[in-house]
Every structure is written in C-alpha cells, then in structure tokens.
C-alpha cells in the first residue's frame, strides 16, 4: 500500500499549514499509510485515546483537557496513548504545548508539531493532502493533454505519431501534462488524476527533433501540472483487420479500466492524409456533447428509424 514519511508531510506542508517541529525529531521516518481497516479519511482526527489516529490533532478542547488533568492521571492517559501506534502529533490553534506531552513525544520518538491554524481546517487540509499522497497509482505509456479543458490520454504502439499529434495540438492552443510516462492516481472512487514525473516535466520527445521544452517554446500556458483523466484516444494502424473490427457508427461506446476506474475510449485509425489533430478535437467536442445528453449517433439512428416508419406507413400511389 502507498505510504509517506512524516518528514515528507512536514516538508510539503510546512508553509501551507504554518508548521513548527517542536519535539520528536527522531521519528521523522515514521510512516503514514493506508490499510484495509483504516481508510485515508480515518488517518487524521482529534485526540483519541482508545483508537489513536496516525495523525493526532489537538484542538482547544483537547489541550484544555490535558492541562486540567492531575499529573498522575495525565501520565496514565499518555502511557495508554503512546502504547498505541502513532505517526505524528499536532497541536493546533497556536496553543502552548503541554510540557508532559512534549516529553512523551521526545522519549517515544513521535514527532510533535504546532500550527497556528484552527484544528478543523488543519484536519481538512491534511485529509485532502493524504488522499492524494496515498492514492493508488499506475504509470501508462502515452501523452497526456488538456484539450478543451478535458484530460485526454493519447495511447498507441510505438511510432504511431503520438508525440507529433501532441505537438500539433499544443500549437493549436491546448496544453500538455506529461509525455511518455503518465502517472495516474486514483484520488476518488471514479476519479483518476494524471501527473508528470518530475524528471520529465515540460519535455516532449519528437522523432527527428529530439527533446523539446514545451514551456520554453510555447510559454507557461502550454503546460499543466495535473489534470483529471476523462477520455482515452487510442491510435491504431488503419489496416484491413483494424478497419473490419471498427464500429463505424460507434453505437456502443468503448471503455478501458484503469486501477478500478472506467474511462471512455475512442479508437482512431491512423492513415496517410488523416488530420489526427482535427479528429481528436472533434472526439473531445463530441464527448462534451454526450456529457450534456446530446448523442449524434443515437439522433441519426432515431431519424433513420422514423424515416423508415414513415415510408412503411405512406399510402401507395397507383
């Protein structure tokens, strides 16, 4: 299962959450991860002595409760708490950290952090961050683009012209997310977010031209940091076998399953003289119309059916 360390959580959220590392630096490699019994949303929560969260957050009420406990009762409660598995403790609302809590975090190598943010907002941000950081992921070969604000993944065998097609679409004003290796993360039950590996960011490899820096050539608006995948364009060679298997009316929409998420798929035969960039734009426009309930294929079938019915019911003229 995916996991991250407390060090990474701190580094990526220090400024956003106004975090200060107070104690327990020896636990910087403590792991935060999912398991079958504890989904992502249950990893973060207010102080819980019975079923501690991986990320324990202390708000106004929790700190006030600890401060009001007698020394012996506080030690008993913290002994019970630190006997369980925790990754990090955070004190919210800019409150002073109870001395006893600081000592326990230091002795048990549990990172203790402070934030000036209110505890409900702090937990919301952490849950969203962990949902993305711990998302199930996979890597697919292709080019991921933003076409008319729709995330489009162009796939196909090697030397099918994916990069050339992407370059043409970028020159038409669309944006690139990733080339060659597309990282897909399941950030929701039916949502896949595509990103680019840091090493390949901004680069597009085109045969004959080499590696191009899209951001430098076309400007900042030509690249996107991430995009939700909505449509797959699969390029195939336009041979007799492929053309025979192709549904020309496209009555039954094709789909592809990616880590448990079903994504709409369009198969485009590649042949000399076909303007693939125009075809991709048309496929995306058609997809947008279908989202609005407008299906050109079904409209044509209904019109054809009505025409045949009218012909059958027309009176014979002798």
UniProtKB/Swiss-Prot annotation:
User: Which reaction(s) does its UniProt entry say it catalyses?
Assistant: [HPr protein]-L-serine + ATP = [HPr protein]-O-phospho-L-serine + ADP + H(+); [HPr protein]-O-phospho-L-serine + phosphate + H(+) = [HPr protein]-L-serine + diphosphate
Q: Tell me how this protein assembles.
A: Homohexamer.
Instruction: Please name the SUPFAM superfamilies in this protein's record.
Output: HprK N-terminal domain-like (SSF75138), PEP carboxykinase-like (SSF53795)
Which biological processes are named by the entry's GO terms? Answer: regulation of carbohydrate metabolic process
Which residue stretches, if any, does this entry annotate as coiled coil? none
Name of the molecule in the record: HPr kinase/phosphorylase
The record's section on InterPro entries has: HPr(Ser)_kin/Pase, Hpr_kin/Pase_C, Hpr_kin/Pase_Hpr_N, P-loop_NTPase, Ser_kin/Pase_Hpr-like_N_sf
- Report the active site residues: 141, 162, 180, 248
Q: What class of enzyme is it?
A: transferase
Q: Which cofactor does it need?
A: Mg(2+)
Q: Which organism is it from?
A: Chromobacterium violaceum (strain ATCC 12472 / DSM 30191 / JCM 1249 / CCUG 213 / NBRC 12614 / NCIMB 9131 / NCTC 9757 / MK)
Q: Which keywords are on file for this protein?
A: ATP-binding, Kinase, Magnesium, Metal-binding, Multifunctional enzyme, Nucleotide-binding, Serine/threonine-protein kinase, Transferase
Q: What is its EC number?
A: 2.7.11.-, 2.7.4.-
| Residue positions binding Mg(2+) | 163, 205
Q: Fill in the misc note.
A: Both phosphorylation and phosphorolysis are carried out by the same active site and suggest a common mechanism for both reactions.
What the record says about its domains?
The Walker A ATP-binding motif also binds Pi and PPi.
Which gene holds the coding sequence for this protein?
hprK
Q: Which family does it belong to?
A: Belongs to the HPrK/P family.
Task: List the molecular function annotations (GO) for this entry.
Answer: ATP binding; magnesium ion binding; phosphorelay sensor kinase activity; protein serine/threonine kinase activity; protein serine/threonine/tyrosine kinase activity
Reported function:
Catalyzes the ATP- as well as the pyrophosphate-dependent phosphorylation of a specific serine residue in HPr, a phosphocarrier protein of the phosphoenolpyruvate-dependent sugar phosphotransferase system (PTS). HprK/P also catalyzes the pyrophosphate-producing, inorganic phosphate-dependent dephosphorylation (phosphorolysis) of seryl-phosphorylated HPr (P-Ser-HPr).
């Amino acid at each position: 299962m995916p996991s991250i360390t407390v060090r990474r959580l701190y580094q990526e959220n220090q400024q956003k959450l106004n975090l200060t590392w107070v104690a327990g630096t020896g636990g910087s490699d403590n792991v935060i991860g999912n398991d079958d019994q504890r989904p992502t949303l249950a990893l973060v929560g207010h102080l819980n002595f019975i079923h501690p969260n991986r990320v324990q957050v202390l708000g106004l009420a929790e700190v006030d409760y600890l401060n009001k406990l007698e020394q012996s009762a506080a030690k008993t409660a913290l002994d019970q708490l630190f006997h369980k598995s925790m990754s990090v403790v955070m004190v919210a609302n800019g409150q002073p950290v109870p001395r006893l809590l600081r000592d326990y975090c230091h002795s048990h190598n549990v990172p203790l952090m402070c934030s000036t943010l209110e505890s409900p907002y702090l937990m919301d941000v952490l849950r969203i961050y962990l949902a993305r950081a711990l998302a199930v992921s996979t890597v697919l070969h292709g080019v991921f683009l933003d076409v008319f604000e729709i995330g489009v993944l162009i796939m196909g065998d090697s030397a099918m012209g994916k990069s050339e097609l992407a370059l043409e679409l970028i020159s038409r004003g669309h944006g690139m997310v990733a080339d060659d290796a597309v990282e897909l993360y399941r950030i929701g039950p039916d949502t896949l977010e595509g990103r680019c590996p840091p090493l390949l960011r901004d680069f597009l490899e085109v045969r004959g031209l080499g590696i191009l820096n899209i951001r430098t050539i076309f400007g900042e608006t030509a690249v996107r940091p991430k995009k939700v995948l909505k449509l797959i364009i699969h390029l195939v060679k336009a041979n007799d076998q492929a053309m025979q298997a192709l549904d020309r009316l496209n009555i039954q929409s094709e789909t592809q399953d990616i880590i448990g998420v079903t994504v709409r798929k369009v198969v485009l035969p590649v042949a000399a003289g076909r303007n693939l960039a125009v075809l991709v734009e048309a496929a995306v426009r058609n997809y947008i119309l279908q989202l609005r309930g407008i299906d050109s294929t079904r409209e044509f079938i209904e019109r054809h059916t009505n025409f045949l019915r009218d012909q059958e019911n027309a009176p014979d003229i002798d």
